Swiss-Prot record:
GO terms for cellular component: cytoplasm. This is Porphobilinogen deaminase. The modification S-(dipyrrolylmethanemethyl)cysteine is found at residue 242. One of its GO terms (molecular function) is hydroxymethylbilane synthase activity. Belongs to the HMBS family. It comes from Hahella chejuensis (strain KCTC 2396). Binds 1 dipyrromethane group covalently. Its EC number is 2.5.1.61. Pathway: Porphyrin-containing compound metabolism; protoporphyrin-IX biosynthesis; coproporphyrinogen-III from 5-aminolevulinate: step 2/4. The keyword Aminoacyl-tRNA synthetase does not apply. It is an enzyme of class 2 (transferase). The lineage of its organism: Bacteria, Pseudomonadati, Pseudomonadota, Gammaproteobacteria, Oceanospirillales.
Length: 311
């Protein structure tokens, strides 16, 4: 008899709960008779809020506690933002599905300025991401970029309190939480190449639980999976965590994929860009090829310097 009850491990931020609830509703609609329960957990990344993420260090800051709950049998599956999911999974766990992607772009949010280019010289911009900091600094070295941690609501509150002239967030999180109206400008990939997997949701599960795997398999989106697989393969070859100045963005037209990648120093002084094109069927190979091209340009030295500063 198939499973009648499923427990989803989730972080407890508003966005994480929205994402888990979204998966719950989709699963219950797909499988009449199935009940789904949420298990809210607190992760290391949620607790350490006074330190820039890159300095907290380690991979999987937002997933480890969820993985432990699955391995201990307290939860059956976990819902993650794909950009937070490490490349390596603990023994016994794996990715069961990647859902259809919301926009992967970054959003410019400000109460005073309509666009990034309108920011005056020396304006204060908040972001938690070395990837965004790198690209912003390259484009606008005059800007003062400060670390901004906390969930979406907290970050918006800090902007509204006047701590920043503008902040940069993932557009997907704002849209999912009903804050589309706060987006003044969606930054193009030319201005801010997105994080690997940004905007996509992934479901992690136990590999020895074929019933749960069968239930979530129907949520898999083939195009998103191919795009994210290419981006993650690039990240994997570069040995990137989720807190490094690496960007990757795949687009699909017909059966062809274009994959763009970026590695840069956080201060924007050195930024390497490259891209590859090829068949969608070779998504992971394209990611590895792009990483090799970036490494040939010197990406390894840039990343070593970053890891050295934040180890």
């Amino acid at each position: 008899m198939p499973k009648q009850h499923l427990v989803i491990a989730t972080r407890q931020s508003a966005l994480a709960l929205w994402q888990a609830e979204h998966v719950k509703q989709r699963l219950e609609a797909l499988h009449p008779g199935l009940t789904v329960e949420l298990l809210g957990l607190t992760t290391k990344g949620d607790i350490i809020l006074d330190t820039p993420l890159a300095k907290v260090g380690g991979k999987g800051l937002f997933v480890k506690e969820l993985e432990t709950a699955m391995l201990e049998g307290r939860a059956d599956i976990a819902v993650h933002s794909m950009k937070d999911v490490p490349m390596e999974f603990p023994p016994g766990l794996g990715l069961g599905a990647i859902l259809e992607r919301e926009t992967p772009m970054d959003a410019f949010v400000s109460n005073q300025y309509a666009s990034l280019d309108e920011l005056p010289e020396g304006a204060v911009v908040g972001t938690s991401s070395l990837r965004r900091q790198c690209q912003l600094s390259e484009r606008r070295p005059d800007l003062k970029i400060l670390s901004l941690r906390g969930n979406v609501n907290t970050r918006l509150a800090k902007l509204d309190a006047g701590d920043f002239d503008a902040i940069i967030l993932a557009a997907s999180g704002l849209k999912r939480l009903g804050f589309s109206g706060r987006i003044r400008e969606e930054l193009t990939p030319e201005v801010s190449l997105p994080a690997v997997g940004q905007g996509a949701l992934g479901i992690e599960c136990r590999l020895d639980d074929p019933e749960a795997m069968a239930l979530i398999a129907q949520l898999q989106d083939a195009e998103t999976t191919a795009r994210v697989s290419a981006e993650r393969a690039m990240n994997h070859r570069l040995q990137g965590g989720c807190q490094v100045p690496i960007a990757g963005y795949a687009e699909i037209t017909g059966d062809q994929m274009r994959l763009r990648g970026l590695v840069g120093s956080p201060d924007g002084a050195q930024v390497l860009r490259d891209e590859v094109e090829g068949p969608v069927a070779a998504a992971e190979a394209l990611g590895t090829e792009l990483a090799e091209r970036l490494l040939q340009q010197g990406a390894g030295k840039i990343l070593e310097a970053v890891y050295g500063n934040h180890s």
